[in-house]
From Swiss-Prot:
Record GO biological process: response to antibiotic
Organism: Agrobacterium fabrum (strain C58 / ATCC 33970) (Agrobacterium tumefaciens (strain C58))
Catalyzed chemical reaction(s): chloramphenicol + acetyl-CoA = chloramphenicol 3-acetate + CoA
Molecular functions (GO terms): chloramphenicol O-acetyltransferase activity
Protein name listed in UniProt: Chloramphenicol acetyltransferase
Active-site residues, record numbering mapped to chain: 78
Function: This enzyme is an effector of chloramphenicol resistance in bacteria.
PANTHER family, alphabetized: ACETYLTRANSFERASE (PTHR43300), CHLORAMPHENICOL ACETYLTRANSFERASE (PTHR43300:SF12)
Family: Belongs to the transferase hexapeptide repeat family.
Length: 209
């Protein structure tokens, strides 16, 4: 298997890797896959190529750790309320399975917000929405939607804490800095690399007038 990464400290932005029409990515988001030696598309498990199929949508400025997995294709034909969870329908070449019903159910798009950090070998289940600014801990199993700026971890993943207080989170969601033009982002970089949300908000307000 080809290793797409020359160093564990250097990720490759997703826009230089992604080819699937059902994998949508924003700007600057990267996958740091050195230790698993595969492309990001290998992280999107069972991603169907069909038009109208569930999509994996990833925002801008996301950091995705090596070996993270996004489980796609809904229930993949497994119905736990049926007598058997086996997907007979998808083996039409077997004569005994000829009259099997199609158990596939879509889960809807999996949506990862902007500025999300996903730890190594975390697993995101189908149809999940991860809010802007969230952090997913290493090897977390995410089975429910994650609120913006929440830090979650564990199996199943639970909220550990919020990155900021509610007022600061509201300001960040109002500013949506990930959509700023390059000139504004450059001017704000000293504040972006600090924890002073109020100062960043003042900068944004003055720059927007």
């Amino acid at each position: 298997m080809e290793n797409y990464f020359e160093s564990p400290f250097r990720g490759i932005t997703l826009d230089k890797q992604v080819k699937s029409p059902n994998l949508v990515v924003g700007k600057y988001s990267y996958y740091s896959g050195y230790y698993h030696g595969h492309s990001f598309e290998d992280c999107a498990r069972y991603l169907l190529p069909d038009e109208g199929a569930d999509r994996l949508v990833i925002g801008s400025f996301c950091s995705i750790g090596s070996g993270a997995a996004f489980i796609m294709a809904g229930n993949q034909g497994h119905r736990n309320e049926w007598i058997s969870t086996f997907p007979f329908f998808f083996m039409p070449e077997v004569p005994e399975f000829e009259n099997a019903a199609n158990g596939y159910l879509p889960a809807g798009d999996t949506v990862i917000g902007n500025d999300v950090w996903i730890g190594s070998e975390a697993i995101i289940m189908p149809g999940i929405t991860v809010g802007d600014g969230a952090v997913i801990g290493t090897r977390a199993l995410v089975t429910k939607d994650v609120e913006p700026y929440a830090i979650v971890g564990g199996n199943p993943a639970k909220t550990i804490r919020k990155r900021f207080d509610d007022d600061s989170i509201a300001l960040l969601l109002e500013m949506k800095w990930w959509g700023w033009p390059a000139e504004r982002l450059k001017a704000a970089m000293p504040l972006m690399t600090s924890g002073n949300v109020a100062a960043l908000y003042r900068f944004w307000r003055s720059d927007s007038l």
